[in-house]
Curated annotation (Swiss-Prot):
This is Glycerol-3-phosphate acyltransferase. InterPro entries: G3P_acylTferase_PlsY. The chain crosses the membrane at residues 2-22, 56-76, 94-114, 126-146, 152-172, 190-210. The keyword Transferase applies.
Length: 235
């Protein structure tokens, strides 16, 4: 139990690193939460600080989730400070990753007012199920391109993750669909993911959490006041 608590604490602290707030302080001497949408995330960094800073913040937030889901757990597996918890390995990585997402949303370093957790959740999922996450990324980019609403893309991508896991696990694994034909050609790139039922359950939990953190965006969408992204950007 002690090791699990330490893993959760370290993952939370990693997730709590307020990348967009740090970027705002360093680049413009501002608290990014006082501008744009008021959110301490990558999307608002794009709006307030420009595309270069926004992209950097987004990448770093993704890395936070991946580190928590992979590196933190692997470190304590190879450098034990006590017995590891008797938990399914995928579930343990998901719990660590979710702790990082929680840290991003409720960062201890900035008054527990952080971002929405989309990028950090994406990093967690990429570390565990890279192929599925890349498919979800395609969904995200397509929706952004067509609608120019990052919030809509984030919500739909979050919902798409568990749906894709379910389709691949319970449909393609029956010997039908793309997975079957890829196996016929002795290529396993499409089936590297850990299609574990824990992943499916946590996928739905994360989707619900993402929808909850986007509740203000949903209200603005319904009232026609949600901001659209501009592709030309600025530095």
């Amino acid at each position: 139990m002690f090791t699990l608590i330490v893993i959760l604490a370290v993952s939370y602290l990693i997730g709590s690193i307020p990348t967009s707030i740090i970027a705002g302080r360093l680049l413009k001497g501002i608290d990014i939460r006082d501008f744009g949408s008021g959110n301490a995330g990558g999307t608002n960094a794009f709006r307030v600080l420009g595309w270069k800073a926004g992209l950097t913040v987004t990448i770093l937030d993704i890395v936070k989730g991946a580190i928590a889901a992979i590196s933190v757990v692997v470190f304590f597996e190879s450098h034990p400070i006590g017995p590891l918890p008797d938990i399914n390995p995928i579930a343990l990585r998901l719990i660590a990753g979710l702790s990082a997402v929680f840290g991003h949303v409720f960062t201890v370093f900035a008054g527990f007012k952080g971002g929405k957790g989309v990028s950090t959740a994406a990093g967690m999922m990429f570390g565990i199920a890279p192929v599925t996450t890349l498919i979800v990324l395609g969904v995200f980019l397509l929706v952004v391109f067509l609608s120019r609403y990052v919030s809509v893309a984030s919500i739909l991508a979050a919902i798409a993750f568990p749906v894709i896991i379910a389709v691949r696990k319970y449909l393609f694994d029956l010997g039908e669909g793309l997975d079957y034909y890829i196996r016929m050609f002795n290529t396993n790139v499409f089936i590297h993911d850990s299609l574990d039922y824990h992943l499916l359950i946590f996928g739905f939990i994360v989707a619900a959490a993402i929808m909850y953190t986007h509740r203000a965006n949903i209200r603005r969408l319904l009232s026609g006041k949600e901001n659209r992204v501009k592709f030309h950007g600025h530095s």
